[in-house]
Amino acid sequence: MGLKKRWRWVSGLLCVWLIGCGGGISEQVRSQVTYSGSFKTLQQEPEKHTGATVIFGGKIIAVDAKEDRTELLVLQLFLDGSDRPEDNDHSDGRFIVRSRQFLDPALYPKGTLITLVGQLEGSEERLIGQRPYRYPVIAPVEIKKWAPRADTGPRFHIGIGVGTTF
């Protein structure tokens, strides 16, 4: 195998490897996670875990940019093997991401999927409609925004005759 062919082959493998590494949270930050329990357990006893470094994901359902901080209200979603939130109807609750830095609502719009590593600051009670709800409050260390996935739903085509499909 010539040097040029070998170089192309190695370059191709390197590109595939780099694309595959374009995942979620950085390994350095992920290694700081100290809480390995479920979101449901943390939500039931947030004071017991205050100060723990957690990793959770979800979908932004509201953004509130205040003078001294930005709050993201997030619907918790389970993470897949790449730390990407699974965008489905399975959730154990909601949490607040409270950042001392300005997070532009145009860059963190409603519906955005995020994964974050952050420190649990405790909890805060707010209303959902008329119902009181206790939100875990997390100060972010790193937030990963996920681009929307292309429609990956099942596709099939059954043709009968000319121009007829189901």
Language-model features: locations:
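Sec-dependent bacterial lipoprotein signal peptides
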Residues: 1-21
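OB-fold and OB-like single-stranded nucleic-acid-recognition modules
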Residues: 21-166
